[in-house]
Amino acid sequence: MLSDQVTTAELHPSAPLTECETGIYHTFCPISCVAWLYQRVEDSFFLVIGTKTCGYFLQNALGVMIFAEPRYAMAELEEGDISAQFNDYHELRRLCVQIQQDRHPSVIVWIGTCTTEIIKMDLEGMAPTLQAEIGIPIVVARANGLDYAFTQGEDTVLAAMAQRCPDWTPDRTATQSTSSPPLVIFGSVPATVVSQLTFELQRQKVEVTGWLPSARYADLPAVGEDVYACGVNPFLSRTAITLMRRRRCKMIGSPFPIGPDGTRAWIEKICHVFGLETTGLAERERQVWSQLEDYLSLVRGKSAFLMGDNLLEISLARFLIRCGMIVHEVGIPYMDARFQAAELHLLMRTCEAAHVPMPRIVTKPDNFYQVQRMRDVQPDLAITGMAHANPLEARGTGTKWSVELTFWQLHGFASAKDLLELVTRPLRRTH
């Protein structure tokens, strides 16, 4: 169950209501998650099983040259595969044996695509047999374009990896040096952010027993009934459900550590659940904000419009409002209101403290109507997908690609300056 979980109805008498539109939605395909996940799991190899279109996307959109030899590849489905003329198992076995000989990974991750869904390819059935034959773990994740947003590809992969985590046993507690319960943090972030967030929690006497994903597959954290889990990204609701229902972890429902305010709230919530008093956290946040004054003076009083692309929009809106901006609308492809309840609560409190109205929250936004609303409010900054950036720039609105925020360091106290540096670039350009 969610520890101290706040439901939407409990947030406030005037709790934020989300509107839902049904417009055509434009985003990257979730198979793009391999671009950052293969860097996080250093001994992995990702095999995307799809069509030529998937291969073109990975090669062109992600900007990776063939000679760079990244640790992911395409298993291209041909006419014979789709018409069942070829044996899927034999073809995948041939590829996995070649990967084993050439790259020596500790784990192979099969990424299913739209085509494998449509032709009902039994990846989950083939993987156990093949991994027993070649002696390498094979994790199956269906990160296809049927999801709402491309970041949900990571959610699918982490949910699959959560099933492979070892079981937590009580005797493991004997090795812990602190009195805090075992805690697993889930979400893919750079190694520097892992170190920073782990250090911040250690300063509050909270010991992190593991991260999902881990840098090495063999180091996946142990999970079970006595283990608490907490996420760092708002698009990981499927992973949270897997950890709660399948692995019986206790989920800590918290805001996400994006921006100094979010990082402080994230740490405070974990400490509150563990019955610990925080020390020096408010002063730590104040120091960070004071160091950002040059950027804050640039954004203060400016307005923003988030069209919606990567499910980070609620957290980003809260951070921008805390920086002194006015956010007119938050478009978001999909929102798990239960998983983001604490973040919504923090957004409301931030708006109340800043004496600004709550932004309009629209799920599955219709881009045509969004552009009309944007024309009415004339925002200074639009955080948008790549498809709309140039037209909006031509109309005089500064834009920032939301996909850049996905690859940027957003989490923790130390990343606040980098985040503002990225967001303020279009404002400095037009200033």
Swiss-Prot record:
The domain of life is Eukaryota
What's a BP term from Gene Ontology annotated to this protein? light-independent chlorophyll biosynthetic process
Which cofactor names does the annotation list?
[4Fe-4S] cluster
Name one molecular function that GO assigns to this entry: 4 iron, 4 sulfur cluster binding
Q: What class of enzyme is it?
A: oxidoreductase
InterPro entries hit by this protein? LIPOR_BchN/ChlN, Nase/OxRdtase_comp1, Protochl_reductN
Compartment list: Plastid, Chloroplast
**Cofactor binding, note field:** Binds 1 [4Fe-4S] cluster per heterodimer. The cluster is bound at the heterodimer interface by residues from both subunits.
- Give the function comment from the record: Component of the dark-operative protochlorophyllide reductase (DPOR) that uses Mg-ATP and reduced ferredoxin to reduce ring D of protochlorophyllide (Pchlide) to form chlorophyllide a (Chlide). This reaction is light-independent. The NB-protein (ChlN-ChlB) is the catalytic component of the complex.
Family, similarity comment:
Belongs to the BchN/ChlN family.
What assembly does the database describe for this protein?
A: Protochlorophyllide reductase is composed of three subunits; ChlL, ChlN and ChlB. Forms a heterotetramer of two ChlB and two ChlN subunits.
Q: What is the name attached to this protein's record?
A: Light-independent protochlorophyllide reductase subunit N
Q: What is the lineage of its organism?
A: Eukaryota, Viridiplantae, Chlorophyta, Nephroselmidophyceae, Nephroselmidales
